[in-house]
């Protein structure tokens, strides 16, 4: 980890520690909320903050999934643009598990809201409507071949099985994205995802 990344990590950890008792919407950095409000995309700052939180969980899902399957990426960001609410940049090395990363944004948003689709019929109906999403839907379906062929349902359930146990890691990365007004490099995301501040070291 470069010295600049070490400083960035220390700053983020200090800010997260200071804001530990606050909910996600309360810790959104003004930079991210203003981006979404000033462009006229949302009627007020409250709505802009809510959208920022959803974007942070979405991108954190992609990032943590990439770490879980052994892929690499350059950085994660929730910078608001014309076509995307954020992005995990330069993902590589996912192999035949790339579809897990593609599904992870939507799965993370459902983990945030505790709205997982438990019935297969409900999930199958939702998958039939899933289009666009910054290219996630297209990439997910394109990557299924090596493991699941065209069976989207089985691939999605497999992705859930890998990601649901990682909810707390996703939450930590999401909160880091919310409090920091710039992109997070790979090494910083790796450290934040791995470090649980609730775990105390032994004597």
Regions found by a protein language model. Name each.
Residues 2-203:
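Soluble catalytic regions of large protease machineries
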């Amino acid at each position: 980890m470069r010295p600049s990344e070490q400083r960035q990590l220390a700053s983020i950890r200090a800010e997260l520690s200071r804001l530990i008792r606050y909910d996600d919407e309360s810790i959104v950095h003004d930079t991210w909320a203003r981006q979404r409000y000033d462009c006229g995309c949302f009627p007020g700052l409250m709505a802009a903050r809510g959208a920022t939180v959803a974007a942070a969980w979405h991108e954190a899902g992609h990032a943590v999934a990439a770490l879980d399957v052994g892929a690499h990426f350059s950085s994660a960001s929730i910078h608001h643009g014309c076509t995307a609410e954020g992005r995990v940049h330069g993902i590589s090395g996912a192999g035949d598990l790339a579809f897990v990363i593609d599904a992870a944004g939507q799965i993370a948003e459902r983990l945030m809201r505790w709205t997982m689709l438990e019935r297969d019929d409900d999930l199958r109906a939702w998958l039939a409507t899933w289009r666009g999403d910054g290219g996630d839907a297209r990439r997910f379906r394109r990557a299924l071949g090596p493991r699941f062929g065209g069976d989207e349902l089985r691939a999605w359930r497999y992705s859930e099985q890998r990601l649901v146990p990682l909810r707390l890691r996703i939450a930590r990365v999401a909160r880091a994205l919310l409090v920091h007004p710039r992109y997070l490099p790979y090494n910083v995301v790796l450290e934040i995802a791995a470090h649980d501040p609730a775990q105390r070291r032994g004597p």
